[in-house]
Regions:
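Short linear interaction motifs
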Residues: 217-220, 298-317
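Short, acidic, Ser/Thr-enriched surface-loop or helix-capping motifs
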Residues: 323-324
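Non-globular targeting/processing and membrane-anchoring segments
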Residues: 1-268, 272-274, 279-287, 329-575
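Short acidic-hydrophobic, aromatic-tinged amphipathic segments that line or gate anion-handling sites
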Residues: 293-303, 446-452
């Protein structure tokens, strides 16, 4: 890089010439070799300047390189500012080249795991070009200063560009290291969970960074405690975002009350927040105050967030992961069985779920909190119509006609007792969205619990799947005998069966009420069979890859839809 006349065009041509000569070198090597060539002259100059007054040889060589021109008082006054500008720009350019080197080292990671690297690697040729052209411009400026010709190379455009590039590289490298920390934590956790040894080891690796002081807040005393309280315990990890409701928190309170008596099981809330703010901390404190169990108070991103999302299918909706004292996962999400069976699902393991999933008498557990008189009716083993729907007119018509059917002499003479339970109404007969929400939430939880097994769905599961497909229809009906689900149907077809009661009531004594009801309904749906559609909320956990229709042997089509109820926390669904 010999002295050239100042000017951006000349600097550009010189840079292209350098790139051409170094064509066979990597991009980071191109930048380093160019900087090394400049450093040779630049370093010589300042070394000679340093030794100028004490070494005769240095003084003689310095005269040849025009060092005194710069060092003498007029030179310092004339070129002092330019020298500082030059020095600062070289330092910034050196940092750019070092950053390019660091990015090159990080290419051992897949860009799928470290997305920050994807665009950064594409920008490296451009960044190196600007590093080299800046070095060329600095060389020209050095020649102008030592030549004392009154000319100068304008460096401010190069300084602006280099500083922009440097800021981008700093942010990229910082983000890349954060993403690498996540992937390394993920790999570490996978290894730990393959050969677990103790629940506390798993818990620390899942939540805290190395330099953090792990602790919990005891919700019953509001005091900080050591994580040693989890030692040799079965731990229920209640994992959620801050967008949870009091209703969702209350689901765990009966479980907490039940397990607190024996002190072997502990519940710990792990809030998942990627970027904490003062507002989110306030929200955290409000939610935490509602929980009597332990809480992780750690205002940094959870170390194992990638593991939680990918291995436990966390999608911002609450999950409950059950871990035994040895650190082994006993259930990746026991929240479904807790919603349906509560403390009856104890100890909340896959084995416990397997036992519960074989039960056919589920309506009593699902209807807890819906109708206080219901347990008595269920224990009497009576037939019950549970019904509801979007169309109030259909609801009124069904109430009227089903009541007439229940009171018909043919039913009374056969000693058949039928009760009607309208879901979604409180004791005063008013609409209650909370009751309806709990009903569908429990139905969905029961269905997901049953479908996680890789076996053919049983009769009850198929009936619940049918019911879920009617969730947004004008009307729907569940017929149970006591707590056992007998039948579910669409409002339109069930209404027709009830309308035409006179045509089949003569068979009630001979065949049996539930059998003839189902047989006649099967006859009706041969003529009028509505489409079946099952909505699966996006955050429930692992979504089935495919689903068979509950009405026919076909595989259901898959659609994606989006839903907003105009409240915080948009409800995304997969259909």
């Amino acid at each position: 890089m010999s002295c050239k006349a100042p000017g951006e065009e000349i600097a550009h041509k010189t840079t292209l010439s350098i790139l051409n000569k170094l064509a066979h070198y990597s991009w980071d090597a191109k930048a380093v070799l160019t900087l090394a060539a400049f450093a040779l002259d630049y370093g010589d100059f300042w070394m000679l300047a340093d030794l100028h007054s004490s070494d005769q040889l240095a003084k003689s060589v310095g005269i040849l390189k025009r060092v005194p021109v710069v060092l003498k008082r007029p030179g310092l006054q004339k070129y002092g500012k330019a020298i500082v500008e030059l020095n600062n720009l070289i330092k910034a350019t050196l940092e750019v080249i070092e950053s390019v080197f660091e990015l090159e080292k990080l290419t051992v990671y897949d860009t799928k795991d470290v997305p920050a690297l994807a665009g950064a690697m594409d920008r490296i040729p451009v960044d190196v070009y600007w590093a080299i052209i800046t070095v060329v411009a600095c060389t020209t400026q050095m020649c102008c200063i030592t030549g004392d010709e009154g000319k100068k190379q304008e460096l401010s455009p190069f300084a602006q560009k280099i500083n922009v590039i440097l800021n981008v590289l700093r942010r990229t490298i910082k983000l890349a290291h954060e993403q690498i920390d996540v992937i390394e934590a993920y790999r570490k956790l996978k290894k730990i969970f393959q050969t677990p040894s103790e629940v506390m080891e798993v818990f620390k690796a899942l939540i805290f960074h190395k330099d953090a002081e792990p602790s919990l807040i005891d919700g019953s005393t509001n005091k900080l405690v050591s994580i040693d309280v989890l030692k040799k315990k079965d731990v229920l990890l209640f994992i959620s975002s801050l967008d949870i409701t009091i209703e969702e928190i209350s689901i765990l309170k009966p479980v907490y009350d039940g397990i607190s008596k024996k002190d072997q099981h502990k519940i710990v809330w792990i809030p998942i927040v990627e970027h904490w703010t003062d507002e989110l901390r306030k929200k955290f404190e409000v939610l935490r105050s509602k929980m009597p169990w332990y809480t992780v108070q750690y205002f940094s991103p959870v170390v194992g967030i990638k593991f939680i999302k990918e291995e436990w299918n966390f999608k911002n909706k609450p999950i409950v992961v059950v871990i035994n004292p040895r650190g082994k996962v006993e259930h990746p999400n026991a929240l479904h069985i807790i919603k349906v069976w509560g403390i009856k699902a104890f100890p909340f393991t896959k084995e416990a779920e397997g036992v519960l999933a074989t039960k056919e008498d589920v309506m009593e557990d699902i209807m807890v909190g819906v109708n206080p008189k219901l347990p008595v009716v269920i224990k009497d083993d009576r037939y019950i119509f549970f019904y509801g729907g979007k169309d109030n007119e259909w609801v009124q018509q069904f109430t009227k006609k089903a009541t007439a059917l229940a009171n018909d002499p043919a039913i009374k003479e056969a000693r058949i007792y039928i009760e009607l339970v309208l879901v979604g109404k409180n004791e005063k007969g008013q609409d209650d969205v909370g009751i309806l929400g709990r009903f569908w939430d429990k139905m969905e939880s029961f269905f997901f619990s049953k479908t996680e097994k890789k076996t053919e769905p049983d009769a009850v599961t198929r009936e619940i799947q049918k019911l879920l497909s009617y969730k947004n229809e004008s009307g729907w009906v569940v017929l149970s005998k006591g707590s056992k689900v007998i039948f579910t149907g669409h409002g339109t077809t069930v209404m027709k069966v009830v309308d035409e009661f006179d045509k089949w009531k003569g068979y009630v004594r001979e065949i049996g009420y539930e059998i003839i009801f189902k047989q006649y309904h099967d006859k009706v749906i041969e003529v009028n069979r509505p489409c079946s559609r099952v909505d699966i909320p996006f955050g429930v956990g692992k979504i089935p890859e495919h689903m068979h229709c509950p009405h026919c042997p076909r595989v259901m089509e898959t659609y994606i839809s989006f839903k907003c109820c105009h409240v915080d926390g948009a409800l995304n669904s997969l259909h």
